[in-house]
Structure formats: C-alpha cells, structure tokens
Amino acid sequence: PTEGSITIAGSVPGPATKEIVSYLPDAAWLPDWMRVEQLVEMFHDFYADFDPARAGEMLAKLELDPKAPLKTLSKGNKEKVQLILAMSRAAKLYLLDEPIGGVDPAARDYILHTILSNYSEDATVVISTHLIGDIEPVLDEAIFLKEGKIFAHRTVDEIRETEGMSVDEYFREGFKC
C-alpha cells in the first residue's frame, strides 16, 4: 500500500502504544551473549506489565535453563524463549509474527497452548503465519493479504459455512500458484 494510516487503540504508534503491545518478530533479535534469566530481568525492567513469575513457570515447563546463555540454545529453544518473554506481558495487543514457523511439529502444540493460556483476557492476539492448518483450531477471524491488499477478512465460521471448506483449504484455493 502507498497510503493509509495505522492507529493502535486510537493512538498513532509511539512510546505510549509500546506499553500496550507485545510484539514477537519472526527473526531472532535478543542479544545472544545474555543468559535467559538476564533477559527476563531486562523485560521486567522495560515493561511494567511483565510478569517474571509467569516467565519462570513457562521456562520450567519447557525445561529451559534460566542460567543458560542464549547463544547455547537451539534455534527452536531461542524462539521459545522469545515467545515466553512476549507472552509474559499483560498486553492489550499481541502481534506474533510466525510464532510456530521455526519449531518442530511436536513443539507447535505447546506453543499454541502457551499463546492461548497466557494472553490477557481483554487482549487481541494477531498471528501472522503461513501455517494455517496448524493454527486454525484457535482462530476466530482470518485476514488474508495478497499483493499488499486485503484479499479476505472473515470469521472462520463464516468461511466454513459459506465456502464449505476449512480455513486452510480456503487459503490454498485463494493463493494457488
């Protein structure tokens, strides 16, 4: 798109909106030299809504060592740490870019469970992904972009009822090569 505007909760993106948005990028962005526990401390210092106890619980469930330097973790475990940090905030808006893209299929279920059981009840969760089939069970709505424009914006129930297909099938049909 060449024009338009973006607002978050009625405000132009800036320092105030960063307080209510928890963003998980699709690429590793945390300093590799830091230990996991230092990252938890950093997030606690930066974000008033960060819950270090929640982060600790999730790290323990995944058997991730808080004392481990990030650089010693596998790619999948680094992504899990990033997800834990993002989901340990009580944000109003969670923007998750390809949260299951780099992890093995067995870990995907845990990640989806982590997302669903750790976001604030009054929050909105936006997940950007190409792995529609894996996240379809947790979707309420789907927005499909094609060549920079909204191709479709519908509830998943509407897609299933009116199109007679799953959201994944609808996606594949709309984006055939």
Regions found by a protein language model. Give the residues of each.
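Conserved ABC transporter NBD signature motif
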Residues: 3-17
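ABC-family P-loop ATPase nucleotide-binding domains
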Residues: 23-81
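Catalytic Walker B motif of ABC-type/P-loop ATPase nucleotide-binding domains
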Residues: 94-98, 103
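Helical segment within the ABC ATPase nucleotide-binding domain
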Residues: 108-121
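A short, surface-exposed alpha-helical micro-motif characterized by mixed small hydrophobic
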Residues: 135-137
